[in-house]
Amino acid sequence: MFDIKKELQKVPHKPGVYIMHDKNDEIIYVGKAIDLRRRVGQYFDSSKKLAKVAAMVSHVEYFEYIIVNNECEALVLESNLIKKNSPKYNIVLRDDKQYPYIKITNEKFPRVLKTRRVLKDKAKYFGPFPNAYAVNDIIDLIHETYKIRTCNLNFDKGQKLKRPCLNYYINRCDGMCVYDVNEEDYNKELLEVENFLNGREDELTKKLTDKMMAASKNLNFELAAKLRDSITNIQVILEKQNITNTKGLDLDMISMAREAETVCVQVFFMRNGKIIERQHFIIDNKYEESNEHIVGEFFKQFYIDLTYVPKQILTDIEIEDRDLIEEMLTEKKGSKVEIKIPKRGNKTDLLEMVRVNAKEGLDKYISRHLKRERNRENAILDLQDITGVKPIDRIECYDISNTSGVDSVGSMIVFKNGAKSSKDYRKFKIKTVEGADDYASHREVLTRRFRRLLDSDKKDNSFDEMPSIILMDGGKGQVNIAKEVLNEFNLDIPILGLVKDDKHRTRGIIYENEEIRLKVNTPLYRLLFAIQEETHRFAINYHRKLHEKNFKKSELDNIALIGEKRKKALMKHFKTLDRIKKASVEELCEVDGMNEKAAENIVNYFKQ
């Protein structure tokens, strides 16, 4: 048992990060402190607690802490832990869209790629870009202008080819896959690409202009026209605007808008005095944090993974931990970074433009959010009318997945108030059923689920909530199995079956032995379709992982002459390893690809 008062006495007076857990071992809050004992102790001092702090502390089952050298290290660690765990009571940065980046890989003869994931792999990332099509255009333009390779060869390991690919013959690559290419010359071209991606397009424009003039001189007017269009389109591709800063500065501009429990933080990126892109983030603010706290938390999480930090960041809000954040960013950049709050002049006008865009982004998000909420409410109301259950807070849906009866698994997915609740999803490895028996597998899954619900001695609390209704991915057979299981536990929960048409699309629901057809594009149809697809996806993913794991780790791997192909054929034919063990030489020889010697090896191996 974790005694909070006793554990507080063990916390050192040192800088670090503290982590609060609830009874389900979920991380619900992460914070930093110059003095861990004093800061953590404040949470449990009843005389000094605010209402929102009291709400969080009431759910704390235990805490842990990590000691670091200084407050700056604590800030970085806190930001990383918040980003990784998304604790319930922290301000969590959530991008309204997952924008793409352009990546220059960290390898011999680096490549230029499009990606949506920023990894800590020492590569260089540029973006994010609001327009995914623009990213494709930018990469195409780079490959048309510079001889940057597109192949996946690993030159660090010395991979080579006998003949170069098509790009070599159309003069888009120097063929380092076959010939010796000067790395220094290659990297010079790559540096021009980096400058272009940082908003300094002069070198690229000059290179294209020179090519255009040469093409025109050689009477190749078609190529010259194409190059002219590329020059014209550079501004459009990078989504540049006519707003400029005469000093040609690199800076970011950050503002926000808030309404009720929702906040939109807007960032504009200025490079070489020109605004090249923007990005906005939606933040849930159900605990009514101050603007200073929200934007301070935004700074910590937003800049922790960015590869490029400008010398200057403008904002119109006085942020928490400003000096500490400046110190963190300065250390990250390797040179001085300033966070400024301008009071007059051109920069205040620019920030006002950012604020207006934040308000616009917030209004659009709320409009979309309200529409989704209305659709969910209407779908739930329709379900209530069909089942007579009010309210419908929790929907559970079940599905079974296997490959020819091998590695059968069950899935339980949960929707709360019409929205998926992935933390409540559960996976079941089928233990008592051999082969592809959908009914028996469903019976096992449902029995295990509701036995845990009613088990008074259970250690696992994850099955404590009772569903309002149950959905079965199937027809009357699956529904009847579910009814039998619930009757065994004396439970009365409405059960609906989700039936599909010949094209495997949701057709309707089975309720009280009758099929109710659904009209496509109604809120109820969209909700049930989403639930059915999510259940199937979750089951399939778990089955594949389990199947791959079991396939890779098999006793058959220890037998001579049994490789991957034969192992796969044996499992497909016999379904289980136990059946293979019991098979005779003659039965084993019936399998595709097997011969007598390989069959004898299997029989002799399992006789040992």
UniProtKB/Swiss-Prot annotation:
GO cellular component term, pick one: cytoplasm
What InterPro entries does the record point to? DisA/LigA_HHH, GIY-YIG_endonuc, GIY-YIG_endonuc_sf, GIY-YIG_UvrC_Cho, Hlx-hairpin-Hlx_DNA-bd_motif, RuvA_2-like, UVR_dom, UVR_dom_sf
What keywords are assigned to this protein?
A: Cytoplasm, DNA damage, DNA excision, DNA repair, Excision nuclease, SOS response
Q: Which GO terms describe its molecular function?
A: DNA binding; excinuclease ABC activity
Write down the Pfam families for this protein, in alphabetical order: GIY-YIG, HHH_2, UVR, UvrC_RNaseH, UvrC_RNaseH_dom
Q: Where is the UVR domain?
A: 202-237
| Protein location | Cytoplasm
One GO term under biological process is: nucleotide-excision repair
Source superkingdom? Bacteria
The GIY-YIG domain covers 13-91
Q: Which PROSITE patterns match?
A: GIY_YIG, UVR, UVRC
Q: What does this protein do?
A: The UvrABC repair system catalyzes the recognition and processing of DNA lesions. UvrC both incises the 5' and 3' sides of the lesion. The N-terminal half is responsible for the 3' incision and the C-terminal half is responsible for the 5' incision.
Give the protein family. Belongs to the UvrC family.
State whether it acts alone or in a complex, and with which partners, per the record. Answer: Interacts with UvrB in an incision complex.
Recorded protein name is UvrABC system protein C
Organism, by scientific name, is Finegoldia magna (strain ATCC 29328 / DSM 20472 / WAL 2508)
